[in-house]
Amino acid sequence: MFEDEFSALQADMVDICNEYSKGFADKIFIYAANEGIILAQHFYCIDFNLYKCSKLNNAGLKVNFDVSKECQGQVLDILNEDIQKIQSVCDKYNQPVPKLMKLVYEPKTKKFNADYKYENQTSDEISVFDNYDAWFEEEKAKLEGGNAEPTGTTKT
């Protein structure tokens, strides 16, 4: 069934990112774009601060995260494969393929939120990288403005 296969792939994306953060993240953010090129990125909220995947060791926790290029590459490979599989599942069931998925998961509460866009989000002036950076900055502003959680800082 479409929903089951689609959900299982999203769960796999969340699982690999949760594993990457060793379960310490309060929120996991996954950006998955599929507009001719596939781009996957992930960042984390820990103790009301945002951290891009390469900066998790700046969180000041007593755990050492493997932020090596090799480990980051392995995570991105899995995320990219899952994005391709999502496209295949959508095609198999004649469903529209999301051009952009913004997934947010809170491991402690198991709260999951997904925002899907089915129209291209890029243009000659705006790249998928620009859109990822804009989402990161949007979440940063929410933290700093106290809209979602107590004020924090962002580690880029």
What is the predicted function of each stretch?
Residues 1-4, 65-70:
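Short N-terminal edge-element motif at the start of the domain
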Residues 36-67, 105, 113-127:
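Extended intrinsically disordered, low-complexity coil regions enriched in Ser, Thr, Gly, Ala
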